[in-house]
Amino acid sequence: MSEATLDHAVAALTDGSKVRIPFWHIDSGRPGEKFMVLAAQHGNEVQGCEAIRRFKEVCERELVAGSVHLVPFANLPAVRHRRSHISLGPEQPYGDDEGHNMNRTWPGKAHGNDTERLSYALNEAVARHCTRCLDLHSWSRFTATATLARLDGGLSEQMARVAGIRFIQWRKPPTGSNDGTTIGALFNDSGRGSITIELAPQWVIRENEVSLGLRAATNLAKLFGMIGGEIEQIDPTWSSAGRMTMRRCASTNSRRPARGCSWRPDSRPRST
């Protein structure tokens, strides 16, 4: 067994206070990938927090190569504030982020706004040392859990195909500056490999979605040779190159998209 070590990324905020963001580090003692799993970049997206806690227990029992770095509360002030961003007040919509959408601030700035400082602290303490990343979210515009990944023949595509999530939404690589980007783009643009999973919806923790997040993290660890055993797959998977189509074509109780939507069976072979 490999015992988890609790550590903290320390962010110095603009008012002079400090935030200690907790993360677990589990090292197998053998060479291998350094796998980062994080959740709650937005403070009301908490399903991934429980998935990470359970994945920690799996890794403590079964990790045979490499190391994992588990961040259950990436945006700890927003989690405490019960808002998507630390800048939001009551009834303010998600879009009023004013530069505080954490997943648009990577790799962060040492002397930026408070959210940029949180990202900077996590990047320095965890992300820049890791080779693979799973970013767990809970966007309520998805009514079924879905993977977001790059369809580029690279690591992101490979990871998406083995995660064990029924729906995959393919996205093109971003264009333009890397100054203030998603953590997924930060990893993928540097050749390290990342996917995002939306464990819908927000505000709640549900057994089904937590189980899906745990399965995805475990499958990825198996893909990377960090945990033994067969990858647990589902059949079929459905994919789409569109955006914002999940609302009208999928539900948590359906086994296939609704008639007329843009989701199609994914026919490409999976990596194992």
Regions found by a protein language model. Give the residues of each.
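Structured catalytic-domain cores with a bias toward divalent-metal coordination
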Residues: 1-272
